[in-house]
């Protein structure tokens, strides 16, 4: 009897859920239709707003070209791409209106342009309008101690919405890697959309790190020690990679900065028909003006690192390798070496990172041999590179490495990480001659630095000449040609 009652209750429960199926389907369908109508209405309003923005004082329609670059005042390689891209477009389309969406609310537009000239020696030929975004904190990694990739990506949608509400462009280019803004501007804003990818938000290498339970800056030790958490994170990464591929595929034009980035974007976005390698612009000519003499303006040897103070740049590896080298030199003879770390700080997190690096050099007892130069002018950067014997780079899987190219053009012997863009595109033989060195571990770096310093001046000069000859393919002029060719589709 009890079994019969349970069976009857189960049937009754199933009938109840079945009775809700069709009403639920109707409700869901109605909500979807309402959502589509609302979004379509917003799109129509934005199209009307776009016409008002693009109409000039003389009544003619002007094309509005916008770049999404929330950290345009940061002073890194990505910002150099932004200013060179703007300059190239202004030369070809002088009648267009140019807009930059930025979150640098602590400065004005003129200060941003002056900073671009001071750091990169770039001056635009036509005015640029800056749209200042108040919600940039939504893409700060410090806001998301867990699920950082997802948090920042969702935050970028809200930041993109703020940008779209203030200015609706005809052509939208994401120049900083916020792929989740692409469908927003394409389907809601009705824009032609393009993207310049410096570094994929997620890569197959990151998946491998989690899968193999290796410790990394994106994989905490407590996760690697727990098989269950590793599995959960791996599922999260695979789901995120799938969504990242969907939003990225919305782009009409995709530009990537290296062979390494190309391989990852092709596997994730699957838009090979509209994807091209556009090497980032490096001001090689300015550095090529530095005479190729053996650096004897200062006693001893100067080692220089150029790169923003971000965690993935792995500056601690440079300091530890340098300390290991100094310890060996102190045994042999008094050291005459100095390490100068040059880079930009975007925010308080970067400033805190610099302070941690200072403490690390103190803990290792090498503080008097290590200097930090933050947000320095371009002329000062050039002066340091002209004096340096070795240029250091330690980022694992660096997407490209503008700092690496600048060091080579300036005549330093480059010692870069044996991965990513430096390995595949930059520190490669030129006409059969070596152009620099690659390393991975702390010991590798220390030993290779010692090897470079032990070389004769003539041998170093030969490597420096080969390196200089190889970097012409990364010039501003080459960038302009390939960039304009790639984005041409957006203007048809």
From Swiss-Prot:
What residue ranges lie in the Lumenal compartment? 1-19
Q: Name one process (GO BP) from the record.
A: protein N-linked glycosylation
- Known pathway: Protein modification; protein glycosylation
Q: What is its EC number?
A: 2.4.1.131
* Catalytic activity, as annotated: an alpha-D-Man-(1->3)-[alpha-D-Man-(1->6)]-beta-D-Man-(1->4)-beta-D-GlcNAc-(1->4)-alpha-D-GlcNAc-diphospho-di-trans,poly-cis-dolichol + 2 GDP-alpha-D-mannose = an alpha-D-Man-(1->2)-alpha-D-Man-(1->2)-alpha-D-Man-(1->3)-[alpha-D-Man-(1->6)]-beta-D-Man-(1->4)-beta-D-GlcNAc-(1->4)-alpha-D-GlcNAc-diphospho-di-trans,poly-cis-dolichol + 2 GDP + 2 H(+)
Q: Which residues lie within the membrane without crossing it?
A: 234-254, 400-420
Q: What is the effect of changing residue 86 to A?
A: No effect on GDP-Man:Man3GlcNAc2-PP-Dol alpha-1,2-mannosyltransferase activity
Q: What does altering residue 86 to P do?
A: Decreased GDP-Man:Man3GlcNAc2-PP-Dol alpha-1,2-mannosyltransferase activity
What keywords were assigned to this record?
Congenital disorder of glycosylation, Disease variant, Endoplasmic reticulum, Glycosyltransferase, Membrane, Transferase, Transmembrane, Transmembrane helix
Q: In the record, what terms sit under GO molecular function?
A: alpha-1,2-mannosyltransferase activity; GDP-Man:Man3GlcNAc2-PP-Dol alpha-1,2-mannosyltransferase activity
Which spans are transmembrane here?
20-40
Which residue intervals are topologically Cytoplasmic?
A: 41-233, 255-399, 421-492
The domain of life is: Eukaryota
Protein's membrane topology: Single-pass membrane protein
Cellular component per GO? Answer: endoplasmic reticulum membrane; membrane
Major localization class: endoplasmic reticulum
Fetch the CDD domains from UniProt. Answer: GT4_ALG11-like (cd03806)
Q: Which cysteines are joined by disulfide bonds?
A: none
Q: Which disease is it linked to?
A: Congenital disorder of glycosylation 1P: A form of congenital disorder of glycosylation, a multisystem disorder caused by a defect in glycoprotein biosynthesis and characterized by under-glycosylated serum glycoproteins. Congenital disorders of glycosylation result in a wide variety of clinical features, such as defects in the nervous system development, psychomotor retardation, dysmorphic features, hypotonia, coagulation disorders, and immunodeficiency.
Job of this protein: GDP-Man:Man(3)GlcNAc(2)-PP-Dol alpha-1,2-mannosyltransferase that operates in the biosynthetic pathway of dolichol-linked oligosaccharides, the glycan precursors employed in protein asparagine (N)-glycosylation. The assembly of dolichol-linked oligosaccharides begins on the cytosolic side of the endoplasmic reticulum membrane and finishes in its lumen. The sequential addition of sugars to dolichol pyrophosphate produces dolichol-linked oligosaccharides containing fourteen sugars, including two GlcNAcs, nine mannoses and three glucoses.
- Sequence similarity: Belongs to the glycosyltransferase group 1 family. Glycosyltransferase 4 subfamily.
What this protein is called in its record is GDP-Man:Man(3)GlcNAc(2)-PP-Dol alpha-1,2-mannosyltransferase
């Amino acid at each position: 009897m009890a079994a019969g009652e349970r069976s009857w209750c189960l049937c009754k429960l199933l009938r109840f859920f079945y009775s809700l199926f069709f009403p639920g389907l109707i409700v869901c369908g109605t909500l979807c239709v309402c959502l589509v109508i609302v979004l379509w209405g917003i799109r129509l309003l934005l199209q009307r707003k776009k016409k008002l923005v693009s109409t000039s004082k003389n009544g003619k329609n002007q094309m509005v070209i916008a770049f999404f670059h929330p950290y345009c005042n940061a002073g890194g390689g990505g910002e150099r791409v932004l200013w060179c891209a703007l300059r190239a477009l202004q030369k070809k389309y002088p009648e267009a209106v140019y807009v930059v969406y930025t979150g640098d609310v602590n400065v004005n537009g003129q200060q941003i342009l002056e900073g671009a000239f001071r750091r990169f020696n770039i001056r635009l030929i036509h005015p640029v309008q800056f749209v200042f975004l108040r919600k940039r904190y939504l893409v700060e990694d410090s806001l998301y101690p867990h699920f950082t990739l997802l948090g920042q990506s969702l935050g970028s949608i809200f930041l993109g919405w703020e940008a779209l509400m203030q200015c609706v462009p005809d052509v939208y280019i994401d120049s900083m890697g916020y792929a989740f803004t692409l469908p927003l501007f394409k389907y809601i804003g009705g824009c032609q959309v393009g993207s310049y990818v410096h570094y994929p938000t997620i890569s197959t290498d990151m998946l491998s790190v989690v899968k193999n339970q290796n410790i990394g800056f994106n994989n905490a030790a407590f996760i690697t020690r727990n098989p269950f958490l590793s599995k959960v994170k791996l599922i999260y990464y695979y789901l995120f990679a799938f969504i990242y591929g969907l939003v990225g595929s919305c782009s009409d034009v995709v530009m990537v900065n290296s062979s390494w980035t190309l391989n990852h974007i092709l596997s994730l976005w699957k838009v090979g028909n509209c994807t091209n390698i556009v090497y980032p612009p490096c001001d090689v000519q300015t550095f090529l003006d530095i005479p190729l003499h053996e650096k004897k303006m200062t006693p001893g040897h100067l080692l220089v690192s150029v790169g923003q103070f971000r965690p993935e740049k792995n500056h601690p590896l440079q300091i530890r390798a340098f300390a290991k080298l100094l310890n060996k030199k102190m045994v042999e003879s008094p050291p005459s070496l100095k390490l100068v770390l040059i880079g930009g700080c975007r925010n308080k997190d970067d400033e805190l990172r610099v302070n941690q690096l200072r403490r690390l050099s103190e803990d290792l007892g090498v503080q008097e041999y290590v200097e930090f130069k933050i947000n320095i002018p371009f002329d000062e950067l050039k002066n340091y590179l002209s004096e340096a014997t070795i240029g250091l780079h330690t980022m694992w899987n660096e997407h490209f490495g503008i700092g690496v190219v600048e060091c080579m053009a300036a005549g330093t012997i480059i010692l870069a990480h044996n991965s990513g863009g430096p390995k595949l595109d930059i520190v490669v033989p030129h006409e059969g001659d070596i152009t620099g060195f690659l390393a991975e571990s702390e010991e590798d770096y220390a030993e290779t630095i010692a090897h470079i310093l032990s070389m004769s001046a003539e041998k170093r000069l030969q490597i420096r000449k080969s390196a200089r000859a190889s970097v012409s393919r990364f010039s501003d002029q080459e960038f302009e040609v390939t960039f304009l060719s790639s984005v041409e589709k957006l203007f048809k």
